[in-house]
Amino acid sequence: VKDIDTKIDAISFFAAVIIVMSLFFFVSAHAVEIKTNTKPLFVYSLNSCITDLNKSIPTEKQIPSELIVAQAVIETGWGTSRFANEANNLFGIREGLKEFKTKCDSVKDYIRIINKVPAYAEFREMRADGITDSLLLARTLKRWAADPNYTDLIEDVIQHNIRGVYEL
């Protein structure tokens, strides 16, 4: 009887641990929801996602918030595009029709792409040299889109729609 009680206690303990861990991962994975109801709500909830992700990213691999926000604004029309709302894809990431579980997951993938894909080596080199200004770093993202004026669009959004408007 004592062995059975010990086994039941052990099973109960491990079941409790699994439940607690599941809740932790559920809460942490869903802690930041990017909202698209209004421009300010989109910007600030997106920035909250970025801030949350940056907690687990080394400083030298982080990407300026205003640059991430500017690209999301361009790619989704302030979070209102069908691609953003049906596929949770904020950056036009196309590997087929790439769908994400959450919008914040698309931000995580964007950060991975910038930090790993050879097309953005110049971005990483400038950042390694201590350049953190979004306008300068934006110039290195020519290959993100086919539009030859894409980096000009990023700069325009940063200068006229983000800086001085939102506190990031």
What are these regions (language model features)?
Residues 2-70, 74, 78-168:
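Catalytic cores of secreted/periplasmic lytic hydrolases that degrade extracellular macromolecules
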